[in-house]
Amino acid sequence: AEWISTFRKAGDSILAELYKTKKSKNDKASEINKRIKEYREGKIANLNTVAKSESWDNQTLLNEILLLTYASYIVMLEYRNKVWKYEYMAFARRIGELWEPFCKLAFDFPIKKLTLVDPPDFDEVQTQIKNDAIGYIESLDLSEEIKAELKRHYDIPWTMVDSGGIKLGLDLHFEQNGIHYNCDFKSGFSSNEKGNTNRLLLVASIYNSLGEIEKNILFVRQTEDENNHYL
């Protein structure tokens, strides 16, 4: 309640300024979202400073940041609605947009030690897989002619792969205790998501081929009977 009150005061100030302008409702909505986000980031920075000076533990800091952020989302939705009424689909989509960064806070301010990492480059992964396969073929007790034929057949499917079109980057990648976690966040499912589902299956299969240190996680907001067919 305290954080909601704090953000509503900021929202009132922003709204008072916007009502004096001739901006469109679209521009006013964007400005509200932008200004409240900036205000929230400033408050989070202040919390970090206080946490260090008062030696907060990670759990205490994360809890306060989650409360602060949740309050900012409530006010952001309220004040955007004051200048431009939400339609049902626009509201549902906006909730999905806010859900992912809210979940990521637990990884940006972790309780247990972890390291955010960049996803691997597909060309490098492809080279590694090819080298492993060729090394295995070379180790077989076969004639050079048969080995060459095996390599030729092995190369055929790779010629059908457009390396530039396969991006291994998901919504979140982190390393913890020697394990690489590759995570994607899905709020809901709509008719245009089938291609994305197929991509996720492809990317997950590539990570699985890299060995036991790769773990894939899919975070979903809605259950299957509530419009999430990723499950």
Q: Model regions: which residues?
A:
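Nuclease-adjacent, charged terminal/linker segments that flank catalytic cores
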Residues: 1-110, 119-121
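Surface-exposed cleft-lining segments at the edges of enzyme active sites
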Residues: 86-92, 155-161, 184-192
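Conserved catalytic cores of phosphodiester-cleaving nucleases, focusing on short active-site segments
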Residues: 107, 170-188
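Active-site metal-binding core of divalent-cation-utilizing nuclease and nuclease-like domains
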Residues: 118-177
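Structural beta-sheet core signal
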Residues: 182, 218-219
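Active-site-adjacent loop/helix micro-motif of nuclease/hydrolase catalytic cores
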Residues: 189-199, 227-229
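Short, charged, amphipathic alpha-helix that recurs within catalytic cores of restriction-modification
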Residues: 194-210
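Domain-level recognition of nuclease-like catalytic cores that cleave nucleotide substrates
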Residues: 220-231
